Amino acid sequence: MHSQFTLLDSFLTQTQPFWRYEAFHAYRSEALPWGVQHPGLTQWLNSLSLQEIEEYKADPERLTQILTQFFPSLAEIKRTMTVAKPPCIPSLPLPKHFDKGIPGRKWQQIEAMGKVLIAHNQGKQWLEWCSGKGYLGRILASVSQQPVVSFEYQAELCHSGQQEADALKLPMHFVQGDAFANDSFNLFEPVTHAVALHACGDLHVRMLQYATSAGVEAISFSPCCYHLTHDEHYQAMSSVAQNSALKLTRQELRLPLQETVTGGERVKRHRQQEMIYRLGFDALLSQQLGFSSYVSVPSIQKSQLSLGFAAFCAWASKEKGISLDLECADFAYFEHIGFQRFWQMERVSLVQEGFRRLLEIWLVLDKALYLQEKGYHVSVSEFCERQVTPRNLVVNAHRTKD
């Protein structure tokens, strides 16, 4: 695992110009982020039709095959960094209607994670970190019949989760608390198997720190939202990552999260329309008022998009308190600029996509190596298929026996 990380770290360091940029802001520069370093890559990007851009975005494997023509070592790195696929585990013996009230894809994630955790169970009790209503904990309690402590910040979720667990007669106890408060450390005991599904940023980091300090029997977690941290730059956990030349910004930590599989064609079109409107509004501000930097606009209800670009500009200028002469604005012109900028953003982001998973593996390996350094036997694998969620990596660790 150490040699894997070192190899990956070297590759990402050498290829920084091709992934360390914000595609959203790339349209503001006439030059591509990598300048004149790779004219063949630039020529290929500029030759793509809009349909081809969409097709490559929907098919990461096909995109990787193309990108390896420009980065010959990319294919070998991806092969070396391949993690174990989801294991073939029989269905769990769960009662009927156990998934009541849980959206289908979310339930698939929870059930898949539950299977992996049961297969790797090492402790005598579970600690479900950042539990929400305890959906994952219900599976663990039902199948293992071991007690589950579900730790959650939001009191209403604790109350609802406890009621449902009691109705199912499950050995679950909800604890409301702040993960960053010192007393939350007391939840970790040597016989505990600490688990977290998609715990965000600093939350999964805090769990690992507490769990290793307490010397818990086992730790299993699937990280998410790496950018949700108090620090401006990524704080590496393992000694090898701390020595890396890569000092990732909070914004760069968003990159692995930009691949999504949720939503259908309607959701995709809504996203495109909203981005075109935002970029068109930005162009209007730039040309009419001389704004030199992008103005962030609040989220908008998707139903409002159907009112058209002019209505969006009126709404956005009101939200931001900006005085605009909308009567004289050529909305068709600025909407077209937004359209062009959106597809330039999508075009440039294709190159980043070839590195996105590798950056996520870099982040996950840092945590895995940290656990190794703390005396745990560690494995990294996928707990479900990408189509269920791209955030499908799980780290399983158990204390090394003396």
Where are these regions (language model features)?
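Conserved hydrophobic residues forming the short capping helix/wall of the S-adenosyl-L-methionine
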Residues: A165
